[in-house]
């Protein structure tokens, strides 16, 4: 660097108000300085502004003097830090390091949660570059059911042991009642285009086959098989065949009644509204039944539904199904197929589910999210949501409440 120039970092703090940044940079503009870096944050109307600039040495004294007077007039604090060429070059060299986004989400965020998470990042050699809040300002009344808090940490570096870090974060999420997502910060994170959902216990808060079984008087038998399958203890296809056989003779009208009263999962309406508004393609890939999937398709404008079709003859279930069973392997095939049809890279896909048969598609998708999932699924997933509704997915995609609310209330 030219020895006639020098680098100076200024840090300004104080009560924020319109025009403050303009006033500071106007002073700098009198000396035609080069801005090398600038960052600003506002927390509870308190400003923190940092500017790194290069100026002629002969001007530095006058610049600092004028800035001191300006800061006094504005009622803010200002400090000056000289930056050596070596320090600056070292800072520039770090820009080639890997970047990640760690999203923390919950009904509320506590100092204990943030301490635990940031300690793990430090142990892994990761540095936090920035932190921002994605959710709106929190009310003091914590009793409100729709309250949630989310922050996004931009971190830099390469984890020393990615698998160990993932395990530790997942353990914390269970112990401290919070959700997290750790994603590479690249172009695909901002360009997700296809999202595939499991249906039962994900989009809806029930297992449809259990509802049918109750009406058929075989609830206990079917429920036991369902739970065993979702835990991954028995093959899904085998369990499905056993359960469907127990429904033989049930009247078709029962399915209509159940469909009209499906308990929709918290946050689904908001999530679907936003996804459709921003042009995402949406699919249901379910080990449940097409009858209920198509009902949700009409309700929310879902683009694709792949599930299992029950055979019905003379208005009665026969105890058999038509076509291939949609199991974990089939969900992967369908995700690939839809991505190909939509001309979407697999890295641009999202998969959300709760059961063992969802794990293959969660692993394949660019972003796989376990939602209120079984322990085996949570243990093998890279992202999970357990504390809030399904619209928590939006925060993992980087959406901010303030940004969404500008485009319509939910």
Where are these regions (language model features)?
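Solvent-exposed alpha-helical segments within well-ordered globular domains of core cellular machineries
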Residues: 22, 26, 65, 69, ...
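Active-site neighborhood of HAD-like aspartate-dependent phosphohydrolases
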Residues: 187-237
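Short glycine/serine/threonine-rich phosphate/pyrophosphate-binding segments
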Residues: 20, 113, 203-206, 358-361
């Amino acid at each position: 660097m030219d020895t006639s120039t020098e680098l100076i970092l200024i840090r300004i703090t104080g009560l924020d108000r319109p025009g403050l940044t303009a006033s500071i940079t106007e002073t700098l503009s009198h000396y035609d300085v080069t801005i090398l870096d600038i960052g600003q944050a506002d927390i509870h109307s308190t400003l923190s502004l940092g500017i790194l600039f290069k100026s002629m040495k002969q001007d530095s004294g006058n610049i600092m003097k004028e800035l001191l007077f300006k800061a006094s007039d504005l009622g803010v604090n200002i400090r000056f830090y000289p930056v050596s060429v070596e320090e600056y070059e070292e800072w520039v060299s770090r820009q080639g390091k890997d970047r990640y986004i760690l999203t923390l989400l919950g009904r509320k965020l506590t100092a204990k949660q943030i301490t635990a998470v940031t300690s793990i990042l430090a142990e892994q050699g990761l540095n936090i570059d920035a932190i921002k809040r994605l959710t709106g300002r929190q009310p003091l009344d914590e009793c409100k059911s729709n309250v949630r808090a989310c922050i996004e940490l931009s971190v830099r570096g390469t984890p020393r042991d990615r698998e160990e870090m993932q395990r530790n974060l997942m353990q914390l999420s269970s112990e401290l009642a919070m959700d997290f997502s750790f994603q590479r910060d690249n172009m695909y994170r901002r360009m997700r285009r296809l999202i595939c959902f499991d249906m039962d216990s994900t989009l809806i808060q029930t297992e449809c086959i259990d509802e049918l079984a109750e009406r058929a008087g075989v609830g206990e038998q079917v429920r036991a098989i369902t739970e065993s399958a979702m835990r991954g203890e028995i093959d899904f296809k085998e369990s499905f065949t056993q359960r469907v056989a127990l429904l033989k003779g049930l009247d078709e009208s029962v399915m209509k009644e159940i469909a009209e009263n499906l308990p929709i999962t918290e946050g689904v309406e908001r999530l679907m509204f936003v996804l459709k508004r921003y042009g995402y393609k949406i699919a249901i890939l379910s080990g449940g039944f097409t009858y209920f999937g198509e009902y949700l398709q009409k309700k929310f404008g879902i683009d694709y539904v792949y599930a299992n079709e029950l055979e019905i003859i003379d208005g009665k279930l026969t105890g058999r199904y038509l076509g291939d069973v949609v199991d974990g392997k089939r969900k992967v095939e369908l995700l690939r197929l839809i991505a190909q049809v939509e001309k979407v890279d697999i890295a641009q896909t999202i998969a959300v589910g709760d059961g063992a048969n969802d794990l293959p598609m969660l692993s394949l998708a660019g972003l796989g999210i376990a939602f209120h999932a079984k322990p085996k699924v949570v243990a093998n997933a890279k992202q999970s949501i357990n504390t809030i509704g399904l619209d928590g997915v939006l925060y993992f995609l980087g959406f901010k409440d303030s940004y969404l609310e500008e485009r319509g209330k939910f």
